[in-house]
């Protein structure tokens, strides 16, 4: 009788665990962004503002909205990640950076640029910079080779998660380089 009871309990346990197969991780917030320049200097950026929702796995969804500071907010200047940019030998020289969101490549990415003199001026107009998706899911963009503030706007639309996020970093002049990159 004990053997039959033990066997029944074991079967019940196995059946209950069968429904607990490996679950796919669902992104519950926007991923971090890694920005790398051609000289392999990089900076990791978390999203400041986002609108995000994701599947709970039971037919329901959940989400969050985070309203971060404006990219030019003077109070955020000291905590904004800084990517060292080489000094150009030509005023017309642009630098390519790679935007990597890990395993969660967005559907679209665009950038906005402001001069470093715009810190604190939240009414300043930005310049648009396009980003091009690569085969590996990263994006590349040509940045203006000067001190400045860059906002990366990304959007996702998958069955498991969707939303928009803004990432901000600053470019700072570094060592001189010559030739094309």
Q: What function would you assign to each model-found segment?
A:
Residues 1-7:
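Positively charged n-region of N-terminal signal peptides that target proteins for export
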Residues 16-19:
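C-terminal motif of bacterial Sec signal peptides marking the signal peptidase cleavage site
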Residues 21-23:
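Bacterial signal peptide processing site
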Residues 52-120:
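Mature extracytoplasmic domains of secretory-pathway proteins
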Residues 128-135:
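Short beta-strand segments within Ig-like beta-sandwich modules, predominantly Fibronectin type-III
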Residues 140-149:
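Surface-exposed, short loops/turns at beta-strand junctions within beta-sandwich domains
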Residues 154-156:
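Conserved structural position at the C-terminal beta-strand
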Residues 160-173:
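Edge beta-strands of extracellular beta-sandwich domains
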């Amino acid at each position: 009788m004990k053997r039959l009871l033990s066997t029944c309990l074991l079967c019940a346990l196995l059946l209950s665990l069968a429904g607990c197969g490996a679950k796919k991780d669902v992104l519950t917030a926007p991923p971090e962004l890694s920005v790398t320049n051609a000289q392999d200097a990089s900076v990791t950026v978390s999203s400041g503002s986002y609108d995000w929702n994701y599947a709970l796995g039971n037919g329901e969804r959940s989400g969050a909205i985070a309203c971060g500071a404006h990219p030019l907010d003077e109070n955020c200047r000291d905590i904004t990640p800084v990517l060292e940019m080489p000094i150009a030998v030509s005023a017309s020289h642009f630098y390519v950076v790679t935007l990597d969101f890990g395993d969660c490549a967005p559907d679209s990415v665009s950038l906005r640029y402001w001069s470093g003199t715009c810190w604190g001026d939240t009414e300043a107009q930005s310049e648009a910079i396009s980003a091009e998706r690569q085969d590996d899911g990263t994006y590349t963009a040509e940045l203006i080779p000067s001190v400045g503030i860059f906002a990366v706007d990304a959007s996702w639309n998958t069955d498991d998660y969707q939303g928009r996020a803004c990432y901000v970093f600053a470019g700072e002049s570094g060592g001189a380089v010559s030739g094309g990159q």
